[in-house]
Amino acid sequence: MYGGDDFGNTDFYDDYAHTGDPQLDMEYERTFYANRMPDNVKFFLMNFCQAIKEGNLYDIQNMYENTFPQISDHHFDKSAWPEEQEVGAIVDNDKVFLILYKELYYRHIHARIPGGPKLEQRINSFFNYCDFFNLIISSQNPVMLELPDIWLWELVDEFVYQFQNFAQYRARLTDKSQDEIQQLCVNHSNVWSILCILNVLHSLVDISNIKKQLEAISQGIDPQTVAGDFGKLGFYKMLGYFSLVGLLRVHSLLGDYYQAIKVLEPIEIHKKSAYSHIPACQISTSYYVGFAYMMMRRYADAIRTFSDILLYIQRTKQLYSTRSYQNDQINKQAEQMYHLLAICLVLHPQCIDESIQQVLREKNYHDAMFKMQCGDLEVFKSFFVFACPRFVSPCPPAADAPMEDYVKDPMEHQLLVFMDEVRQQKDLPTTRSYLKLYTTLPLTKLASFIDPNASEDDVSKLLIRLLCFKHKMRNLVWSKGPSGLEGTFKSGSELDFYIDDDMIHIADTKVSHRYGDFFVRKIMKFNDLNRKLKNINI
């Protein structure tokens, strides 16, 4: 596996017989594996282990964010890092470091190895996560471990990703033998099970008291007073916070959108917080929250969520542009959110920030949006399939299930639900366009606009369409409070109407832009900045 120029010629290493002296055997192993490994890899692992032992956050973060990806690109672009036995020999089999190393090892295999991980590697990765979480959760006292927040976020995010990836792997029966299916369904039925994932994430939330801490912050109370012995440590506190976001993602992947928003209740998702300093976490949170709102038909909240985070991405690109893999991931998620935003704006037209409108124009979203407004269901479908999460089923196929590919079943179910909602609304843009032209309009005249050969039955059906318009344009909209599920019903349409006998009375409720307030705020901000500059002594 590790042959080639990077590791030199290893032909002269033969299997050796144990001497019977544990000290001599360990020394021999250390020399044996050290000579197989490139010097820069060996020194990196030794220094990485030492930094984690000493809790040197600056060095850990530098090696995690910079050195590890650089060595991966140079030595292990399409191959795995050295295995546990090789690494253990040069770090004195440090238990904590080896668990953390294997987390990176299996993550690298998922990301870089052509064809993806084998079943055994997927199972071993799961048990390694179990070892890590048992180490920090089952301990009677807090584990004194310091890791950078970016690593903690990516650890939780990767944990959920590998669950999702395994669920899809498990659902694809067409490329598996009967022995593999037997292993999956009988011998390893609990590996990467949904109950294990939820149990771990909820345990991290509970042990950190993160919900109590967030509630204390919202009430102006010192969170340390309710944090407990574990939650006082930044390591546990941030793991608890990131686990809330992990639960949001898991419930979204399962199609449980109410619970996805519910689990975030301590977090005021429409406000910035001290915990939102990891761009990838903030972007992922907004993506899943916005998608959940869209599927719950809360389009105004979805539009606000997508618009806010897309503005944030525009303004903070330099924070993550140095890390190419993170940049690619964020760019892809941003592209997905532009697609979802376009869908929401078609179903629920409203004003958004001009810079977001500019991007929609530059990337030709307006052409697709026009087709959707004209009732082109295929465009709705293609936008949804591109932008939705890769849904999974909580239940694996049975051992005696037909040899088919079940991966797409969860996504097709969610697509069916979404398209059913779209079909109910596909005629509303046409109705809206006619109503905007009049202040009063007879029902018969509107029916003739829609269908020149309209009959009495068509007029009756028009009443149903107008009632549908009223219903669909009234959405629950969040206004304040920590719960993203709360809100008040508001009409999202730029017009309102009522029907008196056979006459439709229409009122334009569009609020004109108040540019004066915008310029006053900017002038005041500029004057304040000018005063501060004058007070600076150079």
Curated annotation (Swiss-Prot):
**Superkingdom per UniProt:** Eukaryota
Record flagged with keyword Transit peptide: no
Pfam families reported for this sequence: Paf67
| Keywords carried by this UniProt record | Cytoplasm, Initiation factor, Protein biosynthesis
GO biological process per UniProt: formation of cytoplasmic translation initiation complex
Is this entry keyworded Protease? no
The UniProt GO MF terms for this protein read:
translation initiation factor activity
Q: What is this protein called?
A: Eukaryotic translation initiation factor 3 subunit L
Species of provenance: Drosophila mojavensis
